[in-house]
Amino acid sequence: MATRHQVRQAVVSLLYAHEMGSEMNEFKDEFLEEKKIRNERKIQALETFDAICLKKGELDEILKPYLKEKDIERIGIVELAILRLGVYEMKFTGTDKAVIINEAIELAKELGGDSAPKFINGVLDALKGEM
């Protein structure tokens, strides 16, 4: 069975592909199967992805005050996907905020640029007190 971390990786990848304009309906099931994300974890990944897509505007509004001088459109797509996932989990799940931040940092190390882990940590750490 896939781990929660693998589910988060898949969600970030799906969010990235969605932002890049991929046709997600044909792609989601095949992608998750390829990553061996099945059963409950597949449902969790799809529900999280769909919820983030639906609430993207709300999540971005929560993020904006914590971006300092950075305009949300100037953030890398991978980093923005990780931030949206982190904000979504903080706001809509019961997962401990320290776990969410740690997972986001790990995702940033794996998928983002060199400065991504520090940036993601700073934004989510500042945000956690408000959530």
UniProtKB/Swiss-Prot annotation:
Keyword vocabulary terms for this entry: RNA-binding, Transcription, Transcription antitermination, Transcription regulation
Highest taxon in the source lineage: Bacteria
Gene Ontology biological process terms in this record: DNA-templated transcription termination; transcription antitermination
Cellular component aspect of the GO annotation: cytosol
Any GO MF annotation of the entry: RNA binding
Keyword S-adenosyl-L-methionine tagged: no
Similarity comment: family membership: Belongs to the NusB family.
HAMAP family per record: NusB
Listed NCBIfam families: nusB (TIGR01951)
Function comment: Involved in transcription antitermination. Required for transcription of ribosomal RNA (rRNA) genes. Binds specifically to the boxA antiterminator sequence of the ribosomal RNA (rrn) operons.
Name the record gives this protein: Transcription antitermination protein NusB
